[in-house]
Amino acid sequence: MEAQLSDVEAGRRFYGELFGWTFGQTGESGDSGEDGEDGESDEGGGDAGDPASGPERPKAPGKAEQPGTAERPGRAGRPGVPQQPVTSLRAYLEGEPVAALVRKTDGRMPTVWSVYFHTPDARALAERIRAGGGQVVTPPHPVGELGTAALAADPEGAVFALWEPGGHRGFGRRHEPGTFAWAELYTRDTEAANAFYGDLFHDALFGPDADPDFGRAPVSDVFPAEMPPHFLVHFLVRDVEAALGTVARLGGRVRVPPFETSYGRAAVVSDGQGASFALLQR
C-alpha cells in the first residue's frame, strides 16, 4: 500500500513519529543511521522473500500488499549538490518494508492511501475485473524490476490497485503495531460487493487456507450516506486513544471517533495533508 501526497517530506515526519517508521530508497534497510537516506547498507531492503529477510510467507491472491514504488530520495547536506525534491520513499519498521509514500504528480489527484492486492497475474486479473463490471483505470505496467502494477475500480467506483511481485514481494511486517492490519471496503451495495470480490478473490476469501485481511461494510455504518464507496486502510496500534492524541499533535484530524467493529476498536483519522486512514486496536 502507498500514500499519494503533495509533500512527501511532511509525510515522512508525520508517519515517522506516529508509527516509528524510518525511510529510505528501494534496497535500503531504513535503519542505516540517517533515516535510510544516506547509509550505504549491504543488508538490502528487508523485503519479504529476500534472502536477508528469511523465508517468505506464501500469499494468496487478494492479500493486501505494499507496492514497490519507491525511488532514491535526494541526498541532503552535500555542498554544491542541488537539492532534488523527494518523489517517493519506502517506509520501514525495524528494517522491514511496511508502506510507501509517493509524491502526487498532478495536484488534481486525490490525497489518499491506496490498497494493493497481491496477484500472480495482473493482466489476467485485470481482464476478470472488466468482465465482472469493474474498470481498469491504469492497465498493468512494469515498475522497473520490482513488479507489475495496475489501478482498478469496482462497479461502484471504489478504487484499488493490483501488485504482481517481481523483485519486491510486498510487506515485510504486518498485523503488528505500526503496520498494516486490515482494509475495509465501505460500499453502498454489500451484496454486489460480495459477488464482485468473491469472484475475484475466491480462494483468498473462502479457500481452505483463507486468512483474509479485508472486509466490507455499508458506508452509512461509519460515514455520511453520501460518502462515495472506498477502501480504508487500518494500521494496528497498541492504544487507539493515545494514538489519536499523537495524530492531533502532529497536525492530523480525527474524522470518526473510536467505534467497535467485528475486527477490533477503530477510529478514522487523516494526516496533515488530508489522507485518511484508520487506527485499529485489538
Name each model-derived stretch:
Residues 2-96, 131, 139-147, 185-215, ...:
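Core segments of cupin and vicinal oxygen chelate
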Residues 1-12, 112-115, 163-195, 200-206, ...:
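N-terminal beta-strand motif that seeds the catalytic metal site of vicinal oxygen chelate
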Residues 30, 78-173:
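Active-site-adjacent scaffolding segments
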Residues 1-7, 75-79, 88-90, 97, 103-128, 132-185, 207-218, 222-223, ...:
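Vicinal oxygen chelate
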